[in-house]
Amino acid sequence: MRKIFLSLCLAFCVVLSGCADEGNSKSTVQLLFPNPDSGIWKYIGQLCAQLMREANYEVELHHCTNAAEQVEQLKAAVEKNPAAIVIGAQDANALGEPLTLAKEKNIPVIAYDRLIMHTDAISYYASFENNSVGEFQARYVEEKLGLKNGAGPFTIEFIAGSPDDTNAPLFFNGAFNYLKPYIDKGQLVVPSGQKDFQSVATDGWKPDNAQRRMTEILQKYYADGKSLNVVVAANDDLAEALIRAQESVGYKGTPTILTGQDAGANGIANIKAGKQSMTIYKDPEILCGKIVRMVKAVVEGSQPAINDVTNIRNDVKTIPSYLCIPIIVDSTNVDIVKDFR
């Protein structure tokens, strides 16, 4: 598998170098991304900027610590009248006003990974199959527990992402809807009773919020050695919150099947240590490469390659999109993940 992966990476780099050699005129692209303290977002920003420069674009890279700061960054970016703007939204519901200004100036806007809501100013969207993320987590649980063979009952809890991230409900719904038949049959049991997105969401994706909630659940429903068999955590940070919560209460049940996402440094370390079962790898090189090719197309006045023209809607319009396929990573293939610490 590793040889195949490396071969694909080499082929991908050749494609990108070919794009760079085609010689775009020097045009400025504004890149706006969340949280500079996040290892993955810091890496994504640096990678996208590098690939844009290799494709002969000038780049201005911005990270924000909150939604208000990103709004101001976007307003400033629009004033500079760039060739294109790429946005990984801090808050997908907060960018409507400055995006209206971008549309008035005919500036192409591409949403990176997080769909920006309530605006008709988004030109294109590039992400991964986010419903598939949750479904892949659920399929992993199904296989490990032998649910197809009627095994159970097993206890399960959910830790979802932030309500202001449009991907978070997709992750949760993908997992929950796949596992719901097993919940209905009694093969999976949710002792806390928390089975809807709002009940299991984690404000700001903050691990401390998830840890507090899971500590309460463990103390109330899993005391005296009762086992928590499965936790579907939306990403690696939230998975680590469960690990810390179990350590803080002295959890004595059987090991928990624990999902994650992002293949971050903490997730990979926890998989190697046997504390986390799996993660979902959304390879930043694949998505950043797609973004570069989208920018190149719109700047040159052509149509970017897209693979979904019907399913991605932000409450105002259907957004032409390209959706990549994520990869399940566990202890058997953990070495395919690039180190972006």
Q: PLM ranges: what are they?
A:
Residues 6-7, 117:
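Short amphipathic alpha-helical "recognition" segments used for binding
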Residues 1-4:
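Positively charged n-region of N-terminal signal peptides that target proteins for export
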Residues 19-341:
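A residue-level marker of the well-folded mature domains of exported/periplasmic proteins
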Residues 7-15:
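Bacterial N-terminal signal peptides
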